[in-house]
Amino acid sequence: MLKMGVVLFVFLVLFPLATLQLDADQPVERYAENKQLVSPYERRQIILHALGQRDCCVMPWCDGACDCCVSS
């Protein structure tokens, strides 16, 4: 009787868990097309913004596009 219980447990519980593809197993679809069209400068800005870092410019090139100005 115990052997039959083990066999039922394996086939009814463990086997379906091993064969199911969970969401974590699926490849993530991120907007790959859109990200390939982004220039390296824009990509850097996105990453810096996500990391919470500021983009600083050298003093002669401060035109308002950067967050801070530093002297060289």
Swiss-Prot record:
Endpoints of the signal sequence: 1-24
MF (Gene Ontology): ion channel inhibitor activity; toxin activity
Record remark on domains: The cysteine framework is III (CC-C-C-CC). Classified in the M-1 branch, since 1 residue stands between the fourth and the fifth cysteine residues.
Propeptide cleavage-removed residue intervals: 25-54
UniProt similarity note: Belongs to the conotoxin M superfamily.
UniProt keyword annotations, A-Z: Disulfide bond, Neurotoxin, Secreted, Signal, Toxin
Tissue/organ expression: Expressed by the venom duct.
GO cellular component, one term: extracellular region
Keyword Disulfide bond: yes
Main location, first listed in the record: secreted
Cell compartments where the protein resides: Secreted
Originating species: Conus tessulatus
Pfam short name (any one): Conotoxin
Protein name: Conotoxin TsMLKM-012
SS bonds (residue pairs): 56-68, 57-66, 62-69
